[in-house]
Structure formats: structure tokens, C-alpha cells
Curated annotation (Swiss-Prot), chain A:
SUPFAM superfamilies: RING/U-box. One of its GO terms (cellular component) is ubiquitin ligase complex. Pathway: Protein modification; protein ubiquitination. Its EC number is 2.3.2.31. It catalyses: [E2 ubiquitin-conjugating enzyme]-S-ubiquitinyl-L-cysteine + [acceptor protein]-L-lysine = [E2 ubiquitin-conjugating enzyme]-L-cysteine + [acceptor protein]-N(6)-ubiquitinyl-L-lysine. Belongs to the RBR family. Present with 2250 molecules/cell in log phase SD medium. This is E3 ubiquitin-protein ligase HEL1. CDD domains: BRcat_RBR_ANKIB1 (cd20346), Rcat_RBR_HHARI-like (cd20356), RING-HC_RBR_HEL2-like (cd16625). Members of the RBR family are atypical E3 ligases. They interact with the E2 conjugating enzyme UBE2L3 and function like HECT-type E3 enzymes: they bind E2s via the first RING domain, but require an obligate trans-thiolation step during the ubiquitin transfer, requiring a conserved cysteine residue in the second RING domain. It comes from Saccharomyces cerevisiae (strain ATCC 204508 / S288c). The keyword Repressor does not apply.
UniProtKB/Swiss-Prot annotation, chain B:
PROSITE patterns: UBC_1, UBC_2. Gene3D superfamilies: Ubiquitin Conjugating Enzyme. PANTHER family: UBIQUITIN-CONJUGATING ENZYME E2 (PTHR24067). GO terms for biological process: anaphase-promoting complex-dependent catabolic process; protein monoubiquitination; protein polyubiquitination; regulation of mitotic metaphase/anaphase transition. This is Ubiquitin-conjugating enzyme E2-18 kDa.
């Protein structure tokens, strides 16, 4: 109980801070005035999202080069809490297929310059990681050497007999052929390049199959002569070279991960290409994060790969996630809110910090931690040995360890509760389509008029996400600082606003929804304002060093 | 008509064994330890003339994976070996046993490559740094180290 009281202070309104709070709120209120109209438009507030929208304009230069494009820079119009501002990120969203199509376009574009088959240019570009400048440079210097080096030409003097030439790079049937790879003598199809190294089709397929996943140029088994994509398709009997291209592109993305990132969401195959990385250090300095959005509308941080994590920056986010993983075993255990009575299986909700439980149904007394009977635990402030052992293992000073665990448990529980609520809100979104459809059917409003529900849900989701990560910021902040207390008050305001909007979205009757439409606008606008205020307050904590991850 | 991987490796290794038995090269030899298990061999290498290993014999093990010859065998020195590219456990750093492997290589070419490695170490990526230094600095001392490390093969 005492720990509960202690923690409640974080959420209590302190009279002595009222003037600071009023000043801060007044500052924000002047920026986001809500009009008293009956059907007001939802106020368009500058948010993180608008900065990172994908550019609609197509650039004239069609290339995936690093730093080849001049990114259009637009200054951030938001109020600045400290020196400097960050430009909008210039990025695009691609798929491996999209990248491959772009590669083929470049090959076609370069073909007149190189005057060699397109399939050969593809191999040259693959070798130089699609760095056209570098390739052209080397090509100018040592054209013939390059072709030999990459296995596109041979110095061997091969007869130019037409009939003889036609046998190369084709699958042929041979009788009594002895393959030196499998040492089998049989009637079989075989394959060979101009080098004359001939092997049975099964061995060649086995070899190519292994190589397709490496993303490298595939050569003859006995020399450096290269197989082209059409050769691969001939040997395998179906279009397999696309698999090689996929592997090559994945390898490319891996090598250039300063500019290319896979979308981290499960099963999403999008790649975000950041054209100009020069502004990233400024994001880090000002404790902003470079959030991007893929073609499937997944938003994530380009820097650390996590979901959108405002107001936490990447450093706080990484530290928090690392800590969460480390503590998860204890916390998943400690944070269980309800358990069945070991005796009669009635659900019991735990209240307070005491582990001595009494089932209200059958009066059985047991330990909350180990669910064993309470009698052997005795009295005199005895703690369950399981819990105690965990504490002993954590630190040499049990008292400090216990204090740390309690603080972290408090913030993790809040973080987790909003994560759970966000999932419930997501389920809520599934029913919105039904509601909008019902609105159209029964009341006859247009699709556009029903959009306020979707907009409200979007605002709610963003508010929940910011609120969730704000507890990570609070955890790493100096609790005694005034600004931290203001931050905590902002958390409370946003939490209340979010719950209020969530409650409104539970309404089922279409007629009631339409009647209360002004409330949707008002509450969504308020959530948006409080979300922005919390983000800015959190960023100020970071910029001033009040919030920092301990190393 | 797909060839089973196991079948491929067996036929290949049988063929290699026949070739080795009929080979006239005296400085290398190899054969399976167990007549019923073709995937584990031991090999023997004689140190090349005019090198610090001249006159010495070394024993190696060869473990063939089921996807041999598309992947290289695992080879280790069983005899104690003092060499820049061999570590204390007998592991060997040699490019043709790793990224430069090709299915056309076989036991004979591997053992001949190891033999060449004895006379021409790759000092740019040593597993035994002291040996790499001595090779360039003091061949007499290097030879002493080799002999101090050497053990006669008792089952040859």
C-alpha cells in the first residue's frame, strides 16, 4: 500500500506547480484554438506524420544512387523548443520487384554506351553494386580486362566454327556421358559454356540451386566464366534467375543500410529508400526521429527500425526495449493481475502490494507469488522465496534492487496497459467499416461525411502510441525536476483525453453517432492537441538532459 | 530424374578412392578409416623438399558432408603442426576449402594444395602469428619450432 501511495504522487496535482502548468498550457492553447461551431472542421495540426509523407512528385532522374538526387528540403513549421530545425525526409518506397524493374531500365539505358548485350551489362552492374559511375570509370580504363575478369569473355582461343559454337550455352543430350562431378556414366542432358567445361544437368542444377541464394554472380564450376540469367533459366528449366536477382537485391539493401531499410513489420516486403541521409545527424542532435511510412502504411523509425516511438528518441527506445527483454521473465510473472484460487479456481484480482491472498469464495489463504498455501510462509513480513531469489540474483544490494524493480514495474505496467489498449482499439477499427456502412444505409449520408469516424480512430491510435512511449521517457527522467512533473501532468491529460475518445467510439447506434458528431470533432481535436503537447514536452526533457538513458 | 544427394556423394567418393589407389604420387595418400563409412577419411602428406617441413610426414582428417562435392570437406591436421595458416587445434585457413571451393576439386587436389601451402604460406591472414613472423625473419628458428612441435605418426 505504501508503494502505491508513493507512486500515486506522480499523478497527483501539486498546487505549488499550478502557475507553471497554467503558463505552459496557455502557451499551447493559443496555438490550437477549437472553434465553437456546431459542425466544425477537424483542425489540421502539424504532426510528425505530415513531415514524412512520401513525395508525390516523381523525380526526373530515375536512379537508386546514393546522394545522386537533390532532396527537396522544407523547413519544419512547428514551434521550436531549442536551436535548429529538421528538414522533411525525402524518401520513396520500393519492392524488390520495383528495384529490379528499375535496374532493367538502367541496363537498357546503358546498352548503347557499352555496346555489349544487356545480359552482360547486368552482370557488370551487379559486380559494381549498381554504382554506374564506378563501372563507367573502370570500363573506360580497361574494357577488355574487365570482361575477362568478370567472366564475360575468354582469352582462350576457341574455334570459330559455327557448328561448334552452337553447342555452347545450350542444354544437350549425350549418350554414355561421364560427369566428373558425380562420376556417373549415363545417357543424360549436359550443359557447358564456351570454356568447354561440361557437366551433367543434375550436377549443374544442384550447383546453381546452392548459388541462387547467395546473390553473387554464378560462374562455371571450373573457371571464372559467368552464367547469364538466360543460361540459368535454361539449366534449371524454369525462370530461376529472378531468385538470384532477389538475393542480389537483398544483399544490396544489406550493404547500403544507411540508405535502404526493410519495413520491419511482419510479412511486409517493402523497402524504404532514403535519398539523402545528410539530415539524419540533425535529427539525432535535436532528439527527433526519422519516421517513414511504407507502401502498406506501416510507420517505423528509419534509424532504429522500431515502430514510431515519439516522444522517446532512438537512444531511449533502444535502452527501454533492452531493459524490457531483460526484465520480462520477472515482470510477466509479477504483473499478472488475476489468478485462479489454487483451491476452488475462482478468479481473484490482486489489490495492493501484499502477497498474502484470501479467496473471497472459499476463504483459502495462499501466496500470490508461488500459489502455495500461506501457512508455511509464516508471518513477520516474510517474502516468498521465489521472489526473494530473483532479487538476490539481480543485485548484491537487495534493497536497491527491490526499489529499482518497483520503479520499473510501475512504468512498464503503464506502458503495457496502453499497448493492450491499442490492440483493443485496433479491434475497434475493424467494426468501424460496419458502422460507416450502416450510416450510409440507414441515414443516407455520403462516404465523405462518415470519415470523421476513421479520422477519430487514427487520432486515437496515435495518441495511444505517444502515451505508451511517454512512459519510457518518464522512466529515464529525473523525477525531482519541475519539467518532469509537468510532463507527468501532460501524460495524465492525454490519458484522460484518449479514454474519453475511446469511450465515444464504442457507440453502436448510427443515429446516436450522427447526433453526437460534434463531440467526435471536439474530443479528437483535444487528443491531437494533448498528443502534440506531450511530444514537445518529452523532447524538451531530452534536449535539456533531464531524460537520459543510463549506460 | 533427380539424383539423391547421398547416392551422388557415395559414387563420387568411391571413384576418388579408386583414383587414389591407382595414383603414382607418393607424397600424399588417403583412405576411409572405416570400410563401411565413406564420409570420414584420413590423409597423409609428406613435407615438400627444400622447405622447413622436408622429410616430415603429417596426418590430416577429412570429413565429407552429404552435399559433397558441391560443398567442401572439413579438413584438420591431426598431427601437431607449426604453420602460419594452421591453428593449435589443427584448423586450416585455406581459400579453396572455403569461398574458393569448386565441385571439380577432389581429395588429391586438396592434399596437393595443402602440400603446397606448407612451402608457400599465406602470411596475410595467419592463424599462428608467431609462425608468420618467423617465416620472414628467421628460417633457422622457424625450422627449430617445426621440429619441436613435430610428432612421428605412429600408425603409418
Amino acid at each position: 500500500m505504501s508503494s502505491g501511495t508513493e507512486n500515486d504522487q506522480f499523478y497527483s496535482f501539486d498546487e505549488s506547480d499550478s502557475s507553471s502548468i497554467e503558463l505552459y498550457e496557455s502557451h499551447n492553447t493559443s496555438e490550437f484554438t477549437i472553434h465553437g461551431l456546431v459542425f466544425p472542421k477537424l483542425i489540421s495540426v502539424t504532426s510528425q506524420d505530415s513531415e514524412f509523407d512520401i513525395n508525390e512528385d516523381e523525380d526526373g532522374v530515375d536512379t537508386i544512387y546514393e546522394g545522386m538526387l537533390d532532396a527537396p528540403l522544407t523547413k519544419n513549421n512547428k514551434r521550436i523548443l531549442c536551436e535548429g530545425s529538421v528538414p522533411n525526409l525525402s524518401y520513396e518506397c520500393l519492392t524488390t520487384k520495383g528495384i529490379f524493374e528499375r535496374m532493367l531500365q538502367r541496363v537498357d539505358h546503358l546498352q548503347p554506351i557499352f555496346a555489349i548485350p544487356s545480359a552482360d551489362i547486368l552482370i557488370l552492374l551487379q559486380h559494381y553494386d549498381w554504382n554506374e559511375e564506378r563501372l563507367l570509370e573502370v570500363w573506360t580504363e580497361k574494357m577488355d580486362e574487365l570482361l575477362v575478369e568478370l567472366g564475360l569473355s575468354t582469352t582462350a582461343n576457341i574455334k570459330k566454327d559455327n557448328d561448334y559454337n552452337s553447342h555452347f550455352r545450350e542444354v544437350e543430350f549425350k549418350n554414355d556421358f561421364t560427369c566428373i562431378i558425380c562420376c556417373d556414366k549415363k545417357d543424360t542432358e549436359t550443359f557447358a559454356l564456351e570454356c568447354g567445361h561440361e557437366y551433367c544437368i543434375n550436377c549443374y542444377r544442384h550447383y546453381i540451386k546452392d548459388k541462387l541464394h547467395e546473390g553473387n554472380i554464378i560462374t562455371c564450376m571450373d573457371c571464372s566464366l559467368a552464367l547469364k540469367n538466360e543460361d540459368i533459366d535454361k539449366v534449371m528449366g524454369h525462370p530461376s534467375s529472378s531468385k538470384l536477382m532477389d538475393s542480389s537485391i537483398k544483399s544490396f539493401v544489406q550493404k547500403h543500410n544507411r540508405n535502404y531499410k526493410w519495413c520491419p513489420f511482419a510479412d511486409c516486403k517493402s523497402i524504404v529508400h532514403l535519398r539523402d541521409t545528410s539530415s539524419l545527424p540533425e535529427y539525432t542532435r535535436l532528439h527527433y526521429s526519422p519516421f517513414v511510412k511504407c507502401n502498406s502504411f506501416h510507420r517505423f523509425c528509419f534509424n532504429c527500425g522500431f515502430e514510431v516511438h515519439s516522444p522517446a528518441d532512438c537512444k531511449i527506445t533502444t535502452a527501454w526495449v533492452k531493459k524490457a527483454r531483460k526484465e520480462s521473465e520477472i515482470l510477466n510473472w509479477v504483473l499478472s493481475h488475476t489468478k485462479e484460487c489454487p483451491k476452488c479456481s475462482v478468479n481473484i484480482e490482486k489489490n495492493g502490494g501484499c502477497n498474502h491472498m484470501v479467496c473471497s469464495s472459499c476463504k483459502y489463504e495462499f501466496c500470490w507469488i508461488c500459489e502455495g498455501p500461506w501457512a508455511p510462509h509464516g508471518k513477520n513480513f516474510f517474502q516468498c522465496t521465489m521472489y526473494k531469489n530473483n532479487e538476490d540474483n539481480k543485485s548484491k544490494n537487495p534493497q536497491d534492487a527491490n526499489k529499482t524493480l518497483k520503479k520499473y514495474t510501475f512504468y512498464y505496467r503503464l506502458f503495457n496497459e496502453h499497448e493492450v489498449s491499442a490492440k483493443l482499439d485496433w479491434n475497434l477499427g475493424q467494426t468501424l467499416g460496419t458502422k460507416v456502412h450502416a450510416l450510409q444505409e440507414r441515414i443516407g449520408i455520403s462516404w465523405i461525411d462518415g470519415q470523421f469516424l476513421s479520422e477519430s480512430l487514427k487520432v486515437l491510435n496515435e495518441g495511444r502510441t505517444v502515451l505508451k512511449w511517454s512512459f519510457a521517457v518518464a522512466y529515464y527522467s529525473d523525477a525531482s525536476h519541475n519539467l518532469t512533473k509537468i510532463f507527468v501532468d501532460n501524460q495524465m491529460l492525454l490519458a484522460n483525453a484518449v479514454e474519453s475518445l475511446s469511450e465515444l467510439l464504442q457507440i453502436k447506434t448510427p443515429e446516436v453517432i450522427m447526433k453526437r458528431r460534434p463531440e467526435f470533432y471536439n474530443k479528437a481535436g483535444y487528443v491531437e492537441n494533448r498528443t502534440t503537447a506531450l511530444m514537445e514536452c518529452g523532447r524538451e526533457l531530452l534536449c535539456k538532459g533531464i531524460c537520459k538513458a543510463a549506460e | 530424374m533427380a539424383v539423391e544427394e547421398g547416392g551422388c556423394v557415395t559414387k563420387r567418393l568411391q571413384n576418388e578412392l579408386l583414383q587414389l589407389l591407382s595414383s603414382t604420387t607418393e607424397s600424399i595418400s588417403a583412405f576411409p578409416v572405416d570400410d563401411n563409412d565413406l564420409t570420414y577419411w584420413v590423409g597423409y602428406i609428406t613435407g615438400p623438399k627444400d622447405t622447413p617441413y622436408s622429410g616430415l610426414k603429417f596426418k590430416v582428417s577429412l570429413k565429407f558432408p552429404q552435399n559433397y562435392p558441391f560443398h567442401p570437406p572439413m579438413i584438420k591436421f591431426l598431427s601437431p603442426m607449426w604453420h602460419p595458416n594452421v591453428d593449435k587445434s589443427g584448423n586450416i585457413c585455406l581459400d579453396i576449402l572455403k569461398e574458393k571451393w569448386s565441385a571439380v576439386y577432389n581429395v588429391e587436389t586438396i592434399l596437393l594444395s595443402l602440400q603446397s601451402l606448407l612451402g608457400e604460406p599465406n602470411n596475410r591472414s595467419p592463424l599462428n602469428a608467431v609462425a608468420a613472423e618467423l617465416w620472414d625473419a628467421d628460417m633457422e628458428e622457424y625450422r627449430k619450432k617445426v621440429l619441436a612441435c613435430y610428432e612421428e605418426i605412429d600408425d603409418y
